[in-house]
């Protein structure tokens, strides 16, 4: 077996054993780009060897999405397969694991009318809500694992022939996920321990807010009452550990939906449903993004933020060191799974229940500052020029990051 096949086998095994931490007899519901069919078959093989009772896959096709946006009647863009998402949500609540294979062409929908793209995305977000709630509530174990989609490879390595670009992207994936190491599972155990140490430190400090200061950014993010930091392996409501993201370098918590003030600029592009959004700037008052601009893709971003009132508020704040393995590649991946783990970031939209003590829901969740929305969109703000302080309620502060690196 050559090195590529060996690393691909290791990645698939990581997804099932470390990402999902699959339980014997558990069902798996997978979503994947249609180009990933061979990788999905390998994932299914690993899942069945670990005792999966049923592996069901739902494929997505960006070419079909593009044809729909170009040819379907306008009123058809308000439709989405609610029946499918309701079924997925029911399966998750009944114990099925959720496996997402990521990887897509970040430019697949470029050139299409932004109002059409936004309309379809809004309809899909509404229909997907039951499934999103089950995921953000951690009712079951779930993970995201990357696939080197040719369109994605072309975006990351635009000067290379496609075959070489795909090979280089796979190498980056194997490195970032630790699949290229001799014992990837042991490497992940050590990595999870390191992330959990940072989580324990931050949870012990009980900061009132975080202050981000860097070029174009002077932002104070208030933290939700009874907030909890998370990172690495996370427990579901039933107590089963899973690693939601392969790779991951972040520790994250819930902002207070009404206590975000200041200005912030993105440090990396955002791939938003087949459209690249670059140069994002936002100004917050009392937690609400009163001004949002982008140098490219602004209309698609605006339409997403018009989904509901919570879409212009923050649901996540994450700290990521600028000297981690993904950041040190020097690559811009045009993929949230990778770029969010190369830089500190914030997210518009839905907050995670796991980031609040006791995992409250409904009015209790909102009362403590948890944000609710149909969307959850991470965008990157960290860099080697970013400083981050933890602020206490009395105004004193503790340096957490200097020039993008941990100092604690």
UniProtKB/Swiss-Prot annotation:
Its EC number is 3.4.11.-. Its cofactor is Co(2+); Zn(2+); Mg(2+). A divalent metal cation 1 binds at residues 250, 316, 340, 345. The keyword Cytoplasm does not apply. A divalent metal cation 2 binds at residues 316, 340, 376, 378. One of its GO terms (molecular function) is metallopeptidase activity. Keywords: Aminopeptidase, Cobalt, Hydrolase, Metal-binding, Metalloprotease, Protease, Zinc. Binds 2 divalent metal cations per subunit. Can use cobalt, zinc, and possibly also magnesium ions. Belongs to the peptidase M29 family. Homodimer. PANTHER family: AMINOPEPTIDASE (PTHR34448), AMINOPEPTIDASE AMPS (PTHR34448:SF3). This is Aminopeptidase T. It comes from Thermus thermophilus (strain ATCC 27634 / DSM 579 / HB8).
């Amino acid at each position: 077996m050559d090195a590529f096949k060996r690393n691909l086998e290791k990645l698939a095994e990581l997804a099932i054993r470390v990402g999902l931490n699959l339980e014997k007899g558990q069902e798996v519901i997978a979503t994947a780009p249609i180009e990933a069919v061979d990788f999905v078959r390998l994932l299914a093989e690993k899942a069945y060897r670990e005792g999966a009772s049923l592996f069901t896959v739902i494929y997505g096709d960006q070419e079909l999405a593009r044809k729909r946006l170009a040819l379907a009647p306008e009123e058809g863009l308000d439709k989405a397969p609610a029946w499918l998402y309701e079924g997925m949500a029911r399966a998750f609540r009944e114990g099925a694991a959720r496996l997402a294979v990521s990887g897509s062409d970040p430019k697949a929908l470029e050139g299409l009318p932004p109002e059409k793209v936004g309309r379809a995305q809004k309809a899909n977000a509404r229909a997907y809500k039951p499934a999103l709630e089950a995921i953000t509530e951690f009712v079951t174990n779930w993970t995201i694992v990357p696939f080197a989609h040719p369109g994605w490879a072309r975006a990351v390595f635009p000067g290379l022939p496609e075959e070489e670009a795909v090979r280089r992207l796979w190498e980056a994936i194997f490195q970032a996920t630790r699949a290229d190491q001799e014992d990837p599972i042991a490497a992940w155990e050590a990595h999870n321990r390191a992330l959990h140490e940072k989580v324990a430190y931050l949870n012990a400090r009980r900061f009132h807010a975080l202050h981000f200061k860097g070029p174009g950014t002077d932002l104070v993010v208030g933290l939700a009452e009874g907030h909890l930091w998370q990172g690495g392996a996370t427990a579901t409501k039933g107590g089963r550990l899973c690693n939601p993201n392969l790779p991951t370098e972040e520790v994250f918590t819930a902002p207070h939906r009404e206590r975000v003030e200041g200005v912030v600029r993105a440090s990396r592009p955002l791939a938003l449903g087949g459209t690249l959004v670059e140069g994002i700037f936002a100004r917050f008052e009392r937690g609400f993004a009163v001004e949002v601009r982008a140098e490219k893709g602004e209309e698609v971003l605006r339409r997403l933020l018009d989904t509901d009132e919570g879409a212009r508020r923050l649901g996540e704040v994450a700290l990521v060191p600028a000297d981690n393995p993904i950041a040190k590649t020097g690559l811009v991946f045009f993929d949230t799974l990778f770029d969010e783990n190369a830089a500190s970031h914030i997210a518009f939209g839905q907050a995670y229940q796991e980031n609040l003590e006791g995992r409250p829901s409904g009015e209790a969740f909102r009362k403590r500052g948890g944000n609710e929305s149909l969307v959850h969109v991470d965008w990157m703000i960290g860099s080697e020029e970013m400083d981050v302080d933890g602020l206490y309620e009395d105004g004193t502060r503790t340096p957490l990051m200097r020039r993008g690196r941990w100092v604690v």
